[in-house]
Amino acid sequence: MQITLSNTLANDAWGKNAILSFDSNKAMIHLKNNGKTDRTLVQQAARKLRGQGIKEVELVGEKWDLEFCWAFYQGFYTAKQDYAIEFPHLDDEPQDELLARIECGDFVRGIINEPAQSLTPVKLVERAAEFILNQADIYNEKSAVSFKIISGEELEQQGYHGIWTVGKGSANLPAMLQLDFNPTQDSNAPVLACLVGKGITFDSGGYSIKPSDGMSTMRTDMGGAALLTGALGFAIARGLNQRVKLYLCCAENLVSNNAFKLGDIITYKNGVSAEVLNTDAEGRLVLADGLIEADNQNPGFIIDCATLTGAAKSAVGNDYHSVLSMDDELVKNLFQSAQAENEPFWRLPFEDFHRSQINSSFADIANIGSVPVGAGASTATAFLSYFVKNYKQNWLHIDCSATYRKSGSDLWSVGATGIGVQTLANLMLSRSLK
């Protein structure tokens, strides 16, 4: 079916304020002559077309630009990927941008949607490294990428006790990816950014076990790792020329005779001890290892990204990623990038007093809040702050609840969204110019 864009109103026969009308083998999307609104209308129209069972379309006419093509792709995408879009010819620069967005978006959405039976922690880090290597090979040089994978008991032996503790209960070994994208080829080059992603490939909740309904989508608990990998790959496609390091902290959180238990205490490389009071608050336990490693690189800034708390999702739903940081300038830069890329982020509070709300009688801190009515997203961030020495500057925590939708909407199908890839790539590139 051919799809065209029009600035005229649809005939009343198609309904009041209809955004779609049909003529023979053609569909027409009716715009409102408002940039952001029109992009939304195009995405909504794409969802409607997929909902009608249409799988193959051709976008025709002169009005299709980069942003309209991208909006249509986002709405037309489904997890089964049983569709085909023939895009119009664009000029070289927007054409390359569109293809890079689709390439990185497909990677992120595809890997988040993948079942845990095939995407184990080791497979996740291998796939992430392969993707970045491929991006570097296309847009820079393959030799710009070096990496190592630490898995199984090696994690414990090398002091990555958070990842090891969470993942030791599964037959699928926990793993950590340490990847260095260094286009300068200079081993002494400064690090622009360190990216730290949570990669829990399945989260049963452990002994603090989730109900079935809450567990049904927990193959997606590696959304933070996928998002940061996609963002780095997209930044490379856009010409990133400074050094960035990627740390993915990956495990399965299962119940077994080897699984960690409530009351266990983890002592991290930086000397901080943490008592486990809820095994379903495991994401912060694995991220701590990555943050310590990232902080030791003395980067320009650190971003960690995780599907971390139900509290953030309760606050902003699946429609926004939550941002928590004490660095107002870095937050400002992030929101400038988000606005430029038309992606939704929302700031939640993080203050020093939150750090006193995770007390433990047996360790330095606990992995859940210790006050009767706590701000769950904020106290989770407070936990992470104990693993960043100068936590008030150059560190962003993103609780990425918009990575996945359990139910569809008028904009998105069920499954992963890819929201955030462009914003985080934009932030890296804009900060690299300063």
Curated annotation (Swiss-Prot):
Mn(2+) 1 binds at D203, D280, E282. The active site is at K210, R284. Mn(2+) 2 binds at K198, D203, D221, E282. This is Putative peptidase B. It holds the Pfam family Peptidase_M17. It comes from Haemophilus influenzae (strain ATCC 51907 / DSM 11121 / KW20 / Rd). Keywords: Aminopeptidase, Cytoplasm, Hydrolase, Manganese, Metal-binding, Protease. It comes from the Bacteria. InterPro entries: Leucine_aapep/pepB, M17_PepB-like_N, Pept_M17_PepB, Peptidase_M17_C. Probably plays an important role in intracellular peptide degradation. One of its GO terms (cellular component) is cytoplasm. One of its GO terms (molecular function) is metalloaminopeptidase activity. The gene is pepB. Homohexamer.
